[in-house]
Regions:
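Short beta-strand scaffold segments in enzyme catalytic cores
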Residues: 12-16, 126, 133-138
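Short beta-strand-loop/turn "lid" adjacent to the catalytic site in phosphate-handling enzymes
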Residues: 50-105, 141-147, 152, 181-192, ...
Length: 282
């Protein structure tokens, strides 16, 4: 089985795949202080809770934005005798990239682009509501061409509470109205409906620039469900899009016969890693 890992700045999403089938998924906080011991214990707890065996995992594929945790995850893979594959923009099996600096495209965005094209077709626009709100565009030929990055909803709310003396933290949930009736509801409107309106506006502009009003729009990320209640801009909400993309990249690597392996003693904790040849750029 494959354990797909999406290491975000705030949460780490995991999915266990048997072939192409997603058997189980879960999330845990991303803590940069975690050691391999702590990660291993947490994994064993999740697997036990769902009646699964960690021994069944023969490969772990990573896509993440927290490189300092890569060494610890490699050590966990070593303990359970699983291959460790680091997904990145230059991994041989990923979707085609036409970004100005392909090597700088985040691994999570690459995975989202692969999943969007594979499961929903091209052209497509992915809106990922996480620590940051990422919008990624795949053109009609299946190329990732760029997008946008904005502060995430939680970051915005935390900054507001920290810098505005009379505005406290409020629960993150979709408001019932677009006009807030009190201070707490006004903050929710600004955060959630504001994020929805931003997505609507950017998606509309991107569709026009792309010249394809029919581009499929997919929302994903931990907060996608909350925002989706406040807009009709999304054709699909898929909270598992990133880990499905990681699985698809791993599957393609297997088909291509790309040699995989883990090197727990040597990974550079300051830079993304790949174990495959880069895609030739046109």
């Amino acid at each position: 089985m494959l354990l797909a890992i999406d290491m975000g700045n705030t949460q780490t999403a995991m999915g266990l795949f048997d072939g192409d089938e997603l058997v189980q998924s879960w999330r845990m906080p991303t803590d940069r202080s975690y050691t391999a011991d702590e990660i291993h214990v947490r994994l064993m707890g999740f697997f036990k809770m769902y009646g699964l065996s960690l021994d069944a995992v023969d490969a772990i594929a990573f896509a993440g934005v927290v490189p300092q945790l890569s060494r610890e995850w490699h050590a966990v893979a070593d303990r359970i005798a699983a291959d460790a594959i680091v997904i990145g923009p230059q991994t041989a099996a990923v979707t085609k990239l036409r970004a100005a600096r392909p090597q700088a495209v985040g691994a999570d965005r690459v995975a989202n682009a692969v999943a969007a094209e594979t499961f929903y077709g091209a052209p497509a626009i992915v809106v990922d509501f996480g620590t940051a709100t990422n919008i990624d565009v795949i053109d009609e030929d299946g190329y990732y061409i760029g997008g946008a990055i904005a502060p995430g909803i939680r970051i915005s709310m935390d900054a507001l509470a920290a810098r505005a003396a009379k505005l406290a933290s409020v629960p993150l949930e979709a408001p019932e109205h677009a006009i807030g009736r009190d201070t707490e509801e006004c903050i929710k409107v600004g955060a959630v409906v504001g994020a929805a309106a931003m997505a609507e506006g950017l998606v509309a502009r991107m569709k026009r620039e792309l010249g394809r009003e029919d581009a499929t729009v997919i929302a994903t990320g931990g907060l996608a469900g909350i925002v989706a209640d406040s807009t009709d801009a999304f054709d699909m909400v898929d909270g598992q899009l990133t880990i499905k993309g990681i699985c698809e990249i791993y599957r393609r690597m297997q088909k291509l016969g790309v040699k995989q392996g883990h090197k727990p003693s040597t990974p550079d904790a300051t830079a993304p890693q790949t174990f495959a040849k880069p895609i030739p750029q046109n």
